[in-house]
Amino acid sequence: MNLSTIDEQLMLDVLSVPTVSQHEHLLVEFLMDFAKKYDVDANLDDKGNVYFKKGMVADGAFYPCVCAHMDTVQDKQLIWINENKRLEIKIEEYLGRHYLSCEGFGLGADDKAGVLICLTLLKRLPVLKAVFFVEEEMGCLGSEKAELGWFKDVGYVLAFDSPGQDCSWACGGARLFDRQFYENYLVELKQKFTIKNWCNHPFTDIMFLRQDTSLACMNIGAGYYKYHTDGEYCIAEHMDEAAQMGLYLIDKLGNNEYLIPYTSRMRDANNEDDKYFFE
C-alpha cells in the first residue's frame, strides 16, 4: 500500500481488535497501551469512555478534539472476544484500492476506522484531544454520559463516523458548523478532497456533544462501506484521505473556539435553508 498518512501496521492492529457493544474492553486495552507508547494522557470514566489529551495549549487557547466510537454491531465477533483473539483481516486490491474485510464475521469498521483515524492524528499532531465512546450503536449511551467538564478547553470536535466518503453537515436536523465555516472552507474541501455526499446524519455521538456543549462539530466519512452487515469492508485509501482531511481542518481551524447554540429543527435536510451549500 502507498498510504501517505496512516501507518499500515497500526491500521491492521486496530481493525483486528474484536469489539461489540458492551464488550469493548479489548479495544480499551489497546487504546491504553497506545497512550503509554505515545506519551498521551489517558483516562477512563465510569461509563467506559476513553479520554486522551496530548500536549498543552497556551492560556486562552483551545484543544482541537477528534472522536469515534469503540463498539460495533458485529455480534459474531463475541467468539473472538471470549477467546481473546484477533480477527483475521482479508486484504484485496482492486483498481489501485485496498479493500479490508473479515470474512464471515463483519469487519466492524463502523467505527474502528474512525478510531484508527483519530489515533493517526494523535501520532502526527503535537496538541490534540480525543474521545472514544462506548455503546454508540445502542443509542449513543456512552456520549450521553460523557464527562462534560473535560470539554471545557475544547474548541471544536471532528468526528469520523460517516460511511464511505460522505460528510455530515447536520445531525438530527441541527447544523454542526456555522454558515461562515462552510462559506470559508467548502470550496477548498471540495477541491482538495473527495466528498461524495453531504448528508443530514440521523443519529450519532456528536448530536449529544452538540446538545450538551454547544461546540461546533463535523462528521467526516471514515471510509467504511456496507456497515452493519457481514459483508462490511473499508478502503485503506479512503481512510487515509479522511485522516488528511482531519489534518487540513485542524490546521485551518487552529486552537480557536467555535460555539453554536444547539437548536434541533428535526426537519428533512432537503427543506433546510443551508441545503444549497451542498448541491
Question: Predicted regions span which residues?
Answer:
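Acidic/histidine-rich catalytic neighborhood of metal-dependent amide-processing enzymes
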Residues: 101-180, 198, 276
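Short glycine/proline-enriched coil/turn segments at helix->beta-strand junctions
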Residues: 36-41, 48, 59-62, 121-129, ...
